[in-house]
């Protein structure tokens, strides 16, 4: 399939996620404020189950899911696991378009990858492409050591929880990190083209 074909095929399966979290402010006046966050998710059943990253929804009071056609739903967290950074959400909807689940164990370095997500929390259904740059890459994400797929598809904040698809349009990974590591002197090394995804076999 062409990248255009894959994009048309998979975009209805990817959702934008917006979260609201009450954050206490430790001031003399007490009080709290609402901190909003954004991420992405992938529909895995036609009746509203959605997989995303645990760090996207962790601590959220309100979670809103927006489908590719703009319809919005309130989502509930069915389960989440911070170690694998996977969470499952549920929305009350039917007739959705679930992603076709691929096999991340059969991936080869150099294969085409297509990432679909909501970068910066405002650019929903953005499609970027690249290749599988490495497999079983040991990466530490928020204190957890993980074995991830490395891809050159452009990944930005807000892409987390979105889908990484292969050239057949099958879901092979859940995007969860990009390189933002610091050197031992504390300088940020924002390398481009270093994105990471949880292998779908691990996530499932």
PLM ranges: what are they?
Residues 1-204:
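Serine-dependent protease modules
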């Amino acid at each position: 399939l062409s990248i255009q074909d894959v994009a048309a095929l998979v975009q209805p399966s990817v959702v934008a996620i917006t979260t609201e979290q009450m954050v206490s402010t430790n001031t003399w006046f007490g009080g709290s404020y609402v901190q909003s966050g954004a991420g992405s998710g992938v529909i895995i059943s036609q009746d509203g189950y959605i997989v995303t990253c645990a760090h996207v929804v962790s601590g959220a009071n309100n979670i809103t899911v927006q489908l590719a056609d703009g319809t919005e739903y309130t989502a509930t967290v069915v389960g989440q696991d911070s170690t694998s950074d996977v969470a499952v959400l549920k929305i009350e909807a039917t007739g959705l378009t679930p992603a076709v689940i691929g096999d991340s164990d059969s991936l080869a370095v150099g294969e085409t990858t297509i990432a679909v997500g909501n970068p910066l929390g405002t650019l929903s259904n953005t499609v970027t492409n690249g290749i599988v740059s490495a497999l079983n890459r040991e990466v530490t994400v928020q204190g957890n050591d993980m074995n991830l797929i490395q891809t050159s598809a452009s990944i930005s904040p807000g892409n987390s929880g979105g889908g990484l698809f292969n050239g057949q349009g099958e879901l092979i990974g859940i995007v969860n990190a990009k390189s933002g590591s610091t050197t031992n002197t504390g300088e940020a090394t924002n390398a481009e083209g270093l994105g990471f995804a949880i292998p779908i076999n691990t996530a499932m």
